[in-house]
């Protein structure tokens, strides 16, 4: 028996409610830091095994260039160390080096084209190399093509540090949305065939990006709320995505990922998997099944996470099935929506 068929058989035995004609639903996570944020993390060399064991075939493996400069202050994450010119690029290079070194031994391939997406949909483990924040560009586009050649196919415009790209949700706004460079960057990402991610952006920045982008844009990780927030809202509330903005992203053909921070959607640690699945269903009812995806933020949440290992996402898929969602809907949420946005972005590359 081929290894892929064997693993499918094992997973269907573990999760019998997923037996849709003996086809295992592939899973993608649009925002995951597994092993990246610590030096020499022991999970990096075995990432391929972890993905195969849980049936995760597409992982947005996410670098955080501003990570070494962040800390907790006043109940939220903010910049606590100054950065000099070149520091963010050096941080990016270090993390990228760790990832590329791990890929030499863990049996996972880097997603680079539509053909790779098709293989991933069949169950082969791939990572989409992602940068959370364009800080590593240091305010110019000179190194963007180099990042593309390394395998970057997904860039989140901003993160937690003040930057030349645009305003962030958690700091007092200074630019009224995206800067001129930020607008130029959105266009450049379109031309390079790199997916644009608006997580951590303000509503004004969302407006600017949607006006410019020729391809669908995503919001990889957070939660949708009927309320609004401001930069000085407490804790995770400053990171919410308003329903109005979520609908605008969906109307453009994009998708919104749900992070694993249970308290943000009223779920304690005890109700983790089922609570996450219930929140996914709520999002489906708000913006449509074709615009909802997983964006766990594994290893990126300081506390309160209800998804702590890759196999938890397989349990979420099982919970969605138990709660009555049909196979087509689950496939869209679990894999196809993120894959569709990536495919459209990659196909838009101008040589």
Feature-to-residue mapping (PLM):
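N-terminal hydrophobic targeting/anchoring segments and the immediately downstream early-domain regions
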Residues: 5-173, 227-229, 235-294, 298-351
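Metal-dependent enolase-superfamily TIM-barrel catalytic cores that perform enediolate-based chemistry
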Residues: 150-195, 200-202
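Glycine-enriched alpha-helix->loop->beta-strand junction motifs that scaffold or abut catalytic
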Residues: 152-154, 194, 212-218, 252-255
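Substrate-binding cleft of carbohydrate-active enzyme catalytic domains
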Residues: 188-209, 243-251
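A short linear boundary/processing microfeature
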Residues: 212-215, 225, 348
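Ligand/cofactor pocket segment of small-molecule handling proteins
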Residues: 222
